[in-house]
């Protein structure tokens, strides 16, 4: 049975909450030997480049991750790859969903949040993918909000959802249903 994007996002958020001590990462777009990219006006916010080769196999994602200082978590399985680093400040879940079990969703959870960090990440995503992310929801007390946008990544339409809250930020990249 095919899961809707909301069901997959909910499942990913629950996994991230359970795995908050694990982290993962992706590329090195600024070629400085680290996968984090300084963003924001102070350059102190670090955006992580995950592998976004949708449809690819677990072995491809493992190869992509092998060039960096991230460890594959023992709780990884045929549906999910989890990586960790020493800082445990970021969690990345690579999810392989569907019959072919190719990469279908990537979730990046940052253990710290705040408006300036969220706005830095939003600006970085908009710049990278040439999109404008729209604010779609806000909590009653104004401490939690969601931005979303649709981008073309590797020739595929990808939905990007960024959930921002006081304690952290979740960025989800998923193929639409």
Language-model segments: which ranges?
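C-terminal motif of bacterial Sec signal peptides marking the signal peptidase cleavage site
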Residues: 20-24
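Solvent-exposed serine/threonine-rich low-complexity stretches and specific carbohydrate-binding patches
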Residues: 136-138
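Amphipathic N-proximal alpha-helical interface segments
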Residues: 32-38, 69-120, 140-177
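N-terminal low-complexity, Pro/Thr/Ser-rich intrinsically disordered segments
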Residues: 32-54
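Bacterial signal peptide processing site
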Residues: 26-29
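Amphipathic alpha-helical segments
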Residues: 52-71, 116-134
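Bacterial N-terminal signal peptides that target proteins for export
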Residues: 2-12
């Amino acid at each position: 049975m095919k899961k809707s994007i909301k069901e997959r996002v909910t499942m990913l958020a629950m996994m991230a909450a359970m795995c908050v001590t694990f982290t993962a990462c992706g590329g090195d777009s600024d070629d400085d030997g680290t996968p984090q990219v300084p963003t924001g006006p102070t350059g102190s916010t670090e955006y992580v480049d995950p592998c976004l080769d949708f449809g690819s196999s677990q072995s491809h994602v493992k190869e992509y991750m092998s060039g960096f200082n991230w460890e594959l978590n023992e709780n990884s399985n045929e549906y999910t790859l989890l990586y960790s680093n020493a800082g445990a400040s970021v969690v990345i879940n690579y999810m392989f969903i569907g019959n072919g079990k190719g990469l279908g969703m990537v979730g990046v959870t940052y253990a710290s949040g705040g408006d300036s960090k969220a706005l830095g990440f939003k600006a970085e995503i908009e710049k990278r993918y040439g999109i404008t992310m729209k604010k779609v929801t806000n909590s009653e007390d104004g401490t939690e909000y969601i931005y979303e946008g649709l981008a073309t990544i590797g020739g595929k339409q990808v939905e990007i959802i960024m959930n921002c809250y006081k304690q952290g930020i979740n960025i989800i990249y998923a193929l639409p249903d």
